[in-house]
């Protein structure tokens, strides 16, 4: 539906023509994967936050298929991925667009679960505090992966992309493609978006499995996370008093480890999924 509105290890050098490009788009297509359609309130919200050229939607099953279909319909030099379960804060556009540069291919808005799932926000806050006390970023509750639920992308940076039909990590695949084409993928330093849904733990098994296929997770790193889990849970309980946050952390990390372990055990099976590590 269209709603009109008034090799990874090395990057190619930045061309002279790229340096001369205007850094700030005047209007962008907004891509929304959705199975339920968009309310008029949500469309109005998008128009209040973004200089919209067109709002494009796709009801294709699976996030990867939906994003691939939408990318093929983009008419603008830049476009925004916005999921239908987020709310952009008033400074979203000024922050994201303000980070555009000639070598930037994507700017991801940092998001919060505070409005949608308090247990997730409580645990994230506790881990941020713990990492500060220990002076170790590895204690933060974050796997380094892209999120395209509120992201501005340079269309040229994803030229000829073919997103594999995977249930998770399609965001990371898109980021890798952008970086393979010689552009940087940035994340805003401050929260500019709110997730309005409850965190779904069911896909966490596939987060581990496909994260291993993509080369982002290893059994060793996930064993380390499991070893840290008792300390994380106890600190979270002491810091927030939220038992739900502690049980969430246990379920999530155990499921991710199980998925990673399964992928590790099957690594010699010749699964074509391992080709995902090389976009």
List PLM regions with ranges.
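Non-catalytic, C-terminal membrane-associated alpha-helical segments of glycosyltransferases
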Residues: 203-279
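Short aromatic/hydrophobic "clamp" motif used to bind/position activated sugar donors
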Residues: 79
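Acidic donor-binding loop at a coil-to-helix junction in glycosyltransferase catalytic cores
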Residues: 148, 168-176
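Short, flexible, basic/aromatic active-site loop/helix in glycosyltransferases
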Residues: 125-144
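Active-site donor/metal-binding and catalytic loop motifs
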Residues: 183-205
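Conserved donor NDP-sugar-binding/catalytic core segment of glycosyltransferases
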Residues: 91-122
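Glycine-rich, basic loop-to-helix element that forms the pyrophosphate-binding segment
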Residues: 58-74
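N-proximal low-complexity "stem/linker" segments adjacent to membrane-targeting elements
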Residues: 1-48
């Amino acid at each position: 539906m269209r709603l009109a509105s008034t090799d990874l290890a090395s990057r190619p050098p930045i061309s002279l023509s790229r340096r001369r490009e205007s850094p700030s788009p005047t209007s962008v297509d907004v891509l929304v994967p959705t199975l339920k359609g968009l309310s008029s309130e949500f469309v109005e919200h998008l128009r209040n936050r973004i200089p919209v050229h067109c709002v494009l939607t796709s009801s294709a099953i699976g996030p990867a298929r939906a994003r691939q279909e939408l990318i093929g319909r983009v008419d603008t030099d830049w476009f925004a991925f916005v999921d239908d379960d987020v709310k952009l804060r008033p400074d979203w556009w000024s922050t994201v667009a303000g980070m555009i540069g000639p070598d930037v291919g994507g700017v991801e808005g940092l998001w919060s679960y505070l409005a949608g799932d308090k247990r997730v926000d409580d645990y994230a806050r506790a881990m941020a505090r713990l990492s500060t006390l220990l002076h170790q970023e590895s204690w933060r509750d974050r796997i380094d992966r892209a999120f395209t639920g509120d992201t501005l992308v340079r269309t040229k940076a994803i030229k000829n992309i073919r997103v594999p039909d995977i249930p998770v990590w399609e965001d990371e695949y898109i980021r890798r493609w952008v970086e393979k084409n010689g552009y940087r993928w940035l994340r805003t330093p401050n929260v500019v978006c709110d997730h309005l849904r409850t965190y779904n733990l069911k896909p966490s098994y596939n987060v581990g499995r496909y994260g291993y296929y993509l080369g982002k997770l290893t059994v060793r790193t996930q064993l380390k996370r499991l070893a840290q889990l008792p300390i994380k849970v106890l600190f979270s309980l002491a810091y927030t008093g939220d038992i739900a946050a502690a049980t969430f952390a246990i379920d999530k990390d155990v499921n991710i480890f199980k998925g990673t372990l399964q992928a590790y055990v099957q690594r010699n099976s010749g699964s074509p999924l391992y080709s995902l590590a090389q976009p």
